[in-house]
Swiss-Prot record:
<keyword id="KW-0489">Methyltransferase</keyword>
<keyword id="KW-0479">Metal-binding</keyword>
<dbReference type="InterPro" id="IPR029063">
    <property type="entry name" value="SAM-dependent_MTases_sf"/>
</dbReference>
<feature type="binding site">
    <location>
        <position position="182"/>
    </location>
    <ligand>
        <name>a divalent metal cation</name>
    </ligand>
</feature>
<feature type="binding site">
    <location>
        <position position="77"/>
    </location>
    <ligand>
        <name>S-adenosyl-L-methionine</name>
    </ligand>
</feature>
<feature type="binding site">
    <location>
        <position position="55"/>
    </location>
    <ligand>
        <name>S-adenosyl-L-methionine</name>
    </ligand>
</feature>
<dbReference type="GO" id="GO:0009820">
    <property type="term" value="P:alkaloid metabolic process"/>
</dbReference>
<dbReference type="InterPro" id="IPR002935">
    <property type="entry name" value="SAM_O-MeTrfase"/>
</dbReference>
<feature type="binding site">
    <location>
        <position position="85"/>
    </location>
    <ligand>
        <name>S-adenosyl-L-methionine</name>
    </ligand>
</feature>
<dbReference type="GO" id="GO:0008171">
    <property type="term" value="F:O-methyltransferase activity"/>
</dbReference>
<comment type="similarity">
    <text>Belongs to the class I-like SAM-binding methyltransferase superfamily. Cation-dependent O-methyltransferase family.</text>
</comment>
<comment type="function">
    <text>4'-O-methyltransferase converting norbelladine to 4'-O-methylnorbelladine. 4'-O-methylnorbelladine is a precursor to all Amaryllidaceae alkaloids such as galanthamine, lycorine and haemanthamine, and including haemanthamine- and crinamine-type alkaloids, promising anticancer agents.</text>
</comment>
<feature type="binding site">
    <location>
        <position position="157"/>
    </location>
    <ligand>
        <name>S-adenosyl-L-methionine</name>
    </ligand>
</feature>
<dbReference type="GO" id="GO:0032259">
    <property type="term" value="P:methylation"/>
</dbReference>
<dbReference type="InterPro" id="IPR050362">
    <property type="entry name" value="Cation-dep_OMT"/>
</dbReference>
<feature type="binding site">
    <location>
        <position position="103"/>
    </location>
    <ligand>
        <name>S-adenosyl-L-methionine</name>
    </ligand>
</feature>
<dbReference type="GO" id="GO:0008757">
    <property type="term" value="F:S-adenosylmethionine-dependent methyltransferase activity"/>
</dbReference>
Amino acid sequence: MGASIDDYCLIHKKILHSEDLLKYILETSAYPREHEQLKGLREVTEKHEWSSALVPADEGLFLSMLIKLMNAKRTIEIGVYTGYSLLTTALALPEDGKITAIDVNKSFFEIGLPFIQKAGVEHKINFIESEALPVLDQMLQETKEEDLYDYAFVDADKSNYANYHERLVKLVRIGGAILYDNTLWYGSVAYPEYPGLHPEEEVARLSFRNLNTFLAADPRVEISQVSIGDGVTICRRLY
């Protein structure tokens, strides 16, 4: 049995501070539409010590809808954890769709692998156990113009998001989308100072404040910052 919705509200980062409204969204719109294998993976992940890293079910539906609306086929995922967003993407892609998934910890990915296999989408995924920057640099050298990617989703080490952006804005095609997760960071980015955070959390918070300012001024993309989950920023490449 997975964590209750009340537990979910307490342990997961969220922008929506009304737990009753969050429960309503999850129970009414998200969970009834959640794929069986995504539900199983979510329930397993909610028992994990790093369960707060789980992409929420309502955000998963948002990502799936966007991928389908774009008719995306080639995607990149940086930061996999147990693979909830990865499985979401794989299910949304067509049968010949491909995902290059990069994470430093394969053991977390292996938690989700049985659910990916049961869903019949393992063939769409190329998992690479590595730091992301060297892999992206290699991809930049090897990827031809006609093989650029349609979509990228980043949910990894927060201090490197700006570095990932510089690579992804070249790897994703013009008109393609780059999504950054957690960009509102509990809502704490609204304040110049936010006492009480763990030092690592504060580093991430400041990184996101800098990233948000940078993306808003980047002429290569147009952006929309969506207050779902812990905040998702969508960048559409312009040139």
